[in-house]
Amino acid sequence: MAENLAGQRLGGFYTEEMRTRGERRGFRLIAFDGEQAVIAHVDFPRAHRVGKYGVDVDAIDRAAESALTPHRGIGLYLVDEIGKMECLSQRFVSRMRDLLSGRVMLVATVAKRGAGFIAEVKRREDCELWTLDRANRDAVAAEILAWLANR
């Protein structure tokens, strides 16, 4: 979706899988300002774990502070994703709540399952929800872009 918004100054980030010989080993967060951070990896000996991944909550905190703090000139934030790993960071949750209650546009992917903040976002009456899967992702992206154009 970000490619379709070229020329617009974006806030937020997307998450990229880290693979070795075809096997997923971790996740890297890439902010639209160019900052990057490895937020989870199978080799991280962390207290916080989601599945087989150790989660670096401090890295998520730093990324949230930088990428999700509202800045003048940014009217649209893209966030991929609001998931279990990201929600281990209270700073991430706090910054997301600030964006959700603010005057900027926000498009985010939200984990299919999850309690706490994940469920809270899905219950919000001021949020539009689309179900995204591999089969419909191009059509849904076009629908969201049209929705944004009318805002």
Which residues does each PLM region occupy?
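N-terminal phosphate/diphosphate-binding loop that engages ATP/GTP or pyrophosphate donors
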Residues: 2-52
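Short glycine/proline-enriched coil/turn segments at helix->beta-strand junctions
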Residues: 5-9, 73, 101-102
